[in-house]
Amino acid sequence: MSFKNAISWFEIPATDLSRAQKFYEAIFGITMIPLDTPNLKMRMFPLEDMMTGVGGAVVDSGGFHKPSATDGPLIYLNANPDVQLVLDKVGAAGGKIIVPKTTISPEYGDMAVIIDTEGNRIAFHSVPKG
């Protein structure tokens, strides 16, 4: 078996959903989509096609997920066309850069790591146009 995408959904924990939403909207220039259930409050990242793309959200789960700057998986968010364009907005939006733009290789692009407003360690990745 092979996957088009190894990940189908991700959740970034938030203790202040409004603050987290403003942060991600500011650095990516997007409008997040509210999706609340009885147990979760979510703000989804916009997605063209749920069947072929990777979806995700910032989530207030009432403590089921907890923000962490050191533990757990590291999620890489799409920062195309250039990681630096997103990094340039991180400080003003309330985040902190902990790994600056770093080239992985010419063919695999660049990455960086930040701490978001909720205390999560989040990575960015961009791939050069081929």
Label the predicted regions:
Residues 38-42, 105-110:
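Short acidic/glycine-enriched loop/turn segments that link adjacent beta-strands
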Residues 20-24, 90, 119:
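Conserved active-site tyrosine of GNAT-family acetyltransferases
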Residues 1-21, 73-75, 125-130:
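N-terminal beta-strand motif that seeds the catalytic metal site of vicinal oxygen chelate
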Residues 2, 11-54:
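Core segments of cupin and vicinal oxygen chelate
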Residues 45-50, 114-117, 127:
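Active-site beta-strand termini and strand-to-loop segments that position acidic
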Residues 7-15, 64-91, 110-115:
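Vicinal oxygen chelate
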